[in-house]
């Protein structure tokens, strides 16, 4: 099953997450099919904290990919931010 979830990057104490489409059997930071966006929880005022390529996310959902709970929350947050 394909899932869209976070893959951790960054250094120690400085997390950075890629939003990726991957097979659910792969490791968290392992092989992935496609990078759909990123999330930077420590983004400053002038930095972009969240970017999701919406058309690719829609494609993956259309072919049956499941969103992880955290990614679903981030998508909702990103949609609210885009509407504002």
From Swiss-Prot:
Any single GO BP term: translation
GO cellular component entries: cytoplasm; small ribosomal subunit
MF term (GO), any: structural constituent of ribosome
Keywords: Ribonucleoprotein, Ribosomal protein
A Pfam family assignment: Ribosomal_S16
Domain of life: Bacteria
Family per similarity comment: Belongs to the bacterial ribosomal protein bS16 family.
Name under which the protein is recorded: Small ribosomal subunit protein bS16
Gene name of this polypeptide: rpsP
